[in-house]
Every structure is written in structure tokens, then in C-alpha cells.
Regions:
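Conserved alpha-helix/loop element of class I SAM-dependent methyltransferases that forms part
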Residues: 10-29, 44
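A short glycine-rich, Lys/Arg-flanked "PGG" loop and its adjoining helix->strand segment in the class I
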Residues: 118-130
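Conserved beta-strand signature within the Rossmann-like core of class I S-adenosyl-L-methionine
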Residues: 131-138
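Conserved Class I S-adenosyl-L-methionine
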Residues: 147-166
Length: 195
């Protein structure tokens, strides 16, 4: 079974403030929201967390990117840039070593299924600064009534191994973030940096 998630938003069940505050942004970083969907994380980042920063909102879904471009124009934002791109093929508008934080929410599991992890990780390594961070937030691989099929979810331990194979080390892990599901939360957030 192929899992498609293009254009879906996590805004209804994940709090952008909880997520962004966990990233400890200073306010002047360059931030890339990979697979941004409707851009709710990007919009909140510019509004509250990166007043002197720059945000690239990247998605392969044209409708999402066009909606974001309209939002940018309506609000005269020059530090939010919407880019239509397939991360596996490269984000050509973003220079090598220019991003402080790459953030990906509920997207990496799709590359587990499509076997394009290597392309994604190498692109992230290309665009982050030498001290840059890659933050991945994903559904925990546990049964819940929503989210991707459990067989394509990926654990934080799996991610740590995968990213480690590419010379990236885990520097932060929060296993208690997202929507309440019983005695735990729906997601985890893991951050990697170059070794």
C-alpha cells in the first residue's frame, strides 16, 4: 500500500509553539521547513521565533507552495521564501552550508517507504552549516487512530542509526511531544548535527 501525504496539515493536532520552542531558536537563524505543507510551522517561526531570521518553506505540492506565496505577498514578508522542490532531487534555491536548522515534520517516514533516505540526508548535509542542525519530528511507531500506517513509521532509534551512517550524531531527543495518546504523546523530536 502506497502512503500519500502531500498537502496535509498537522496544524489540527500539533502545536507549532510547542515544537518551535523545543528547537531553542535564537531569532536570527536561517531555518528550512522541509515538507512544509500549508506552512503553519514556517508562518509561526517568522511571526514569533525568527524575527531577524530567514525561513525557507519547501514542499513538492504546488498548491501548498502557491498558497504560501500568496500569504507572503499579502503580508509583505521578505524573510519567508516559499519554494516548490522535491527534496530528493535537491533544493537548488538554497546554497551549500547556508542553513542553521533544517526541520522536517511527519515527512521522513515517507522516505522510509520510497527508499530515498540517502538523497534526503545528503541534501540536508549539503545545505546545513558546519554547526547546523537537522531536526526530525515523527509519529511514534505505536498504534493510534491517525497518522501513517504503523508499518512505515520509524522509531527514533532507527533514525539515530540511519543518520549516524551518514556522519550525523544525535544531540537531542524529546520523546514526549505532540498530541496526548493515553499515557504518552504521539511524536518524538530528534536533532542531529555533523560529527
Amino acid at each position: 500500500m502506497e502512503h500519500k501525504h502531500h498537502g496535509k496539515s498537522s496544524a489540527k493536532f500539533l502545536d507549532s509553539e510547542e515544537i518551535l520552542s523545543d528547537l531553542n531558536l535564537k531569532g536570527d537563524e536561517t531555518f528550512l521547513d522541509a515538507g512544509c505543507g500549508d506552512g503553519y510551522i514556517s508562518k509561526k517561526a517568522i511571526e514569533k521565533y525568527l524575527p531577524n531570521g530567514k525561513v525557507y518553506a519547501v514542499d513538492s505540492y504546488p498548491e501548498s507552495v502557491n498558497d504560501l506565496k500568496n500569504f507572503i505577498a499579502e503580508n509583505s514578508l521578505d524573510n519567508l521564501i516559499a519554494i516548490e522542490a522535491d527534496i530528493t532531487e535537491g533544493i537548488f534555491e538554497v546554497d551549500d552550508g547556508s542553513v542553521d536548522v533544517v526541520f522536517m515534520l511527519n515527512v521522513f517516514h515517507g522516505f522510509k517507504q520510497s527508499n530515498q533516505r540517502e538523497d534526503v540526508i545528503n541534501e540536508f548535509k549539503r545545505i546545513i552549516k558546519s554547526d547546523g542542525k537537522i531536526a526530525i519530528m515523527e509519529f511514534k511507531p505505536v498504534e493510534m487512530d491517525w497518522g501513517p500506517p504503523i508499518d512505515i513509521r520509524i522509531s527514533h532509534a532507527e533514525l539515530e542509526k540511519i543518520f549516524g551512517d551518514y556522519g550525523l550524531k544525535k544531540t537531542y531527543l524529546n520523546v514526549d511531544i505532540g498530541k496526548d495518546i493515553g499515557e504518552t504523546k504521539s511524536h518524538y523530536l530528534i536533532i542531529f548535527e555533523k560529527e
